[in-house]
């Protein structure tokens, strides 16, 4: 696996920024036990590191439809047959919302600036 310094080599500044935000998202998701979306972010990170021009579109696909990345809330716990919020759920979701919004903005800007079919 590449270190943060190695991952940015050969990437545009916009792709480096997207890589950084998506990496933060992946860590936040994994830290809360959210495997599905963490794996999605890992695939986008790998695509960015490989120079795949479709990486922004791969990320943007996570945002559409029911059950999408937009619908995710962190800090939930289900134990002993009961749903409850973790003590840090508010902070987790504030951070998730900020990163999720920034990732969408960056991916959209990169996609829109890239010539070719979508």
Describe these PLM feature segments.
Residues 7, 11-14, 18, 49-52, ...:
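Intrinsic-disorder-associated interaction segments
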Residues 71-118:
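Amphipathic alpha-helical binding modules
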Residues 2-44, 100-115:
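Short terminal alpha-helical segments
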Residues 32-80:
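Amphipathic alpha-helical interaction modules
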């Amino acid at each position: 696996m590449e270190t943060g310094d190695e991952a940015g080599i050969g990437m545009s500044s916009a792709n480096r920024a997207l890589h950084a935000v998506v990496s933060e998202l992946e860590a936040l998701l994994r830290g809360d036990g959210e495997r599905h979306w963490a794996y999605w972010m890992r695939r986008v990170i790998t695509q960015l590191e490989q120079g795949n021009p479709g990486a922004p579109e791969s990320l943007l696909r996570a945002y559409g439809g029911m059950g999408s990345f937009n619908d995710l809330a962190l800090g939930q716990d289900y134990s002993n047959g009961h749903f409850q919020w973790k003590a840090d759920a508010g902070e987790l979701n504030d951070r998730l919302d900020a990163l999720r919004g920034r990732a969408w903005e960056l991916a959209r800007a990169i996609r829109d600036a890239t010539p070719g079919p979508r």
